[in-house]
Swiss-Prot record:
Cytoplasmic side: 1-21, 83-90, 145-153, 221-281, 355-361, 418-431, 494-534
Induction: Slightly induced in roots during phosphate starvation.
UniProt KW Cell inner membrane keyword: no
Annotated organism of origin: Arabidopsis thaliana (Mouse-ear cress)
Name of the gene encoding the protein in the UniProt record: PHT1-8
Transmembrane stretches, start-end: 22-42, 62-82, 91-111, 124-144, 154-174, 200-220, 282-302, 334-354, 362-382, 397-417, 432-452, 473-493
Protein's recorded name: Probable inorganic phosphate transporter 1-8
Length: 534
């Protein structure tokens, strides 16, 4: 009986509720991207306000970037686990509340000692901001995968993730608008060491605006019912699952497919998380999802840091002509160009092709083309690209393709695959583990890049700079990371296109039974039991 109810999800036509779920779930990813990527121009403004235009100390800068990523990794682990323990819906709203409060907290990072105390306060609130952002990752992916039908599930999850591209674009647009407005109001018109006092308000305003999209969707997120798969397979409440599906899918006959008797107590799971049986059944999938996410985030976050330094290196604008607003505007403008020309198209190419050619092929293709681009840019960098200014546009276009193939490739598929591989009672937890591994890769790429490119000058000041040999080495290392991603994907990642979430678990349980494991024979998984009712 339960399998009939869940089959209704897999064969359901695309309805308005699917698009509503994309918007509600995607707005969390929109907020995530806004908050994580607005920090680059904000740190540029802080360097003028609190450091008199000098580069921020490398230790402070790397900590500022890493603290939110560390919070994100923590949130993915904690809220991913809670999503399986107490339900997706109950935890979903809590993540949004944390993001809203932390965004406002970042804007109110004030203290009498100014520089040091403000940075500590900002880091404190950005950790909790990352905590909420991290929780949103596994919950958004899991909720969308469990609501979607199997024909277009990949496109729906990719559409949710594509809201990150819009978040990056809006983050850049808001930053540019704030900079223009404050500059025209009279502050920062001249090039001087001391930034106007209004600039201290400008960067705070940019951070606090990030709370608005989350606040606007909080009401709609609270109206979302629990997913039918969690209710049916984890709570074993088939009647409630049918009622929830009837509410959102406009199918009155769904409730007739469910029994009207009180639901029996849920059967004990045949194996526990991180048990020997779990690793035998799902260890390969968890390794592939986690390691691929780790690799792609090294590339993605390092590429974003390299971006501003590469383009400023090729830019003909004199660096001495920047004031506090121009400095932040230039960084935001660059982010907007990349988002509009490379990042967003990459996301939507994935939305269109993900259910046509599959997750694995797109992931391998993305890693492959990124590896080619990095090697083509890296091998001749010291003797060609760095010495031929007439090719600067060609180099910028080439480097922009990295972001296209990253998003029409592993950056999106690593978000999708963990939401499809694992049983319902472990799905959110395993997605959180995979995402946390990715954020550890982001920390490695971010902190490693900042320290690898640190330069000590005669006046003992630190600054980041595109030194030729180190840039070449960075490109070659990133190319090698992409090649590693190809190998891990090819040998360890399994395709999930066109298959229901239950079919994936059913096949794995059948494999376990064929090996005559007493643990599986004595207690089958809940999905295997449901499938036998056909």
């Amino acid at each position: 009986m339960p399998i009939k109810v869940l089959s209704s999800l897999d064969v359901a036509r695309t309805q308005w509720y699917h698009f509503k779920a994309i918007i509600v779930a995607g707005m969390g990813l929109f907020t995530d991207a806004y908050d994580l990527f607005c920090i680059a121009p904000v740190m540029k403004m802080i360097s003028h306000v609190y450091y008199n235009g000098d580069s921020i100390n490398t230790a402070v800068l790397s900590t500022s970037y890493a603290i939110a990523l560390l919070g994100t990794a923590t949130g993915q682990l904690v809220f991913g686990y809670l999503g399986d323990r107490v339900g997706r819906r109950r935890v979903y709203g809590l993540c949004l509340i944390i993001m809203i409060l932390s965004s406002f907290g970042c804007g109110f990072s004030v203290c009498t000692t100014r520089r040091s105390c403000v940075m500590v306060s900002l880091g404190f609130f950005r950790f909790f901001l990352g905590l909420g952002i991290g929780g949103d990752y596994p919950l958004s992916a899991t909720i969308m995968s469990e609501f979607a039908n199997k024909r277009t599930r990949g496109a729906f999850i990719a559409a949710v993730f594509s809201m990150q591209g819009l978040g990056i674009l809006v983050s850049s647009a808001v930053t540019m608008a704030v900079c223009v407005a404050f500059k025209r109001s009279g502050g920062g018109l001249e090039v001087d060491a001391a930034a106007p006092t209004e600039a201290d308000l400008a960067w705070r305003l940019i951070l606090m605006i990030g709370a608005l999209p989350a606040a606007l969707t909080f009401y709609w997120r609270m109206l979302m019912p629990e997913t039918a798969r969690y209710t049916a397979l984890v709570e074993n409440n088939i009647v409630q699952a049918a009622k929830d599906m009837q509410r959102v899918m406009s199918r009155s006959h769904i409730s007739d497919e469910a029994t009207t008797d009180p639901p029996p107590p849920p059967p004990p799971p045949s194996y526990k998380l991180f048990s020997r049986c779990f690793f035998r059944l799902h260890g390969r999938d968890l390794f592939a999802a986690s390691f691929n996410w780790f690799l792609v985030d090294i590339v993605f976050y390092t590429s974003n840091l390299l971006l501003s330094h590469i383009f400023s290196h090729y830019s003909k604008k004199p660096s001495t002509a920047e004031n506090v607003y121009d400095a932040a505007f230039e960084v935001a403008e660059l982010g907007a160009i990349i988002a509009a020309c490379s990042t967003i198209p990459g996301y939507w190419f994935t939305v269109y092709f993900i259910d046509k050619i599959g997750r694995v092929k797109i992931q391998i293709m993305g890693f492959f083309f990124m590896a080619v681009i990095y090697l083509v840019a890296g091998i001749p960098y010291s003797w060609y690209w760095s010495k031929h200014e007439h090719n600067n546009k060609g180099f910028m276009v080439l480097y922009g393709l990295v972001f296209f193939f990253c998003n029409f490739g592993p950056n999106t598929t690593t978000f999708i695959i963990p939401a499809e591989h694992f049983p319902a009672r472990f799905r959110s937890t395993c997605h959180g583990i995979s995402g946390a591994a990715g954020k550890l890769g982001a920390i490695v790429g971010t902190v490693g890049f900042l320290w690898a490119t640190k330069k000590m000058e005669s006046d003992d000041k630190n600054q980041i700079y595109p030194e030729v040999n180190r840039m070449r080495i960075a490109f070659l290392i990133l190319g090698g990371v992409c090649i590693a991603g190809i190998l891990v994907t090819y040998f360890f990642t399994k395709e999930t296109m066109g298959r229901s979430l239950e079919e994936n678990e059913h096949d794995q349980d059948n494999n376990a039974e064929s090996e005559d494991e007493p643990q599986i024979v004595d207690g089958q998984s809940s999905v295997s039991t449901l499938l036998q009712t056909r």
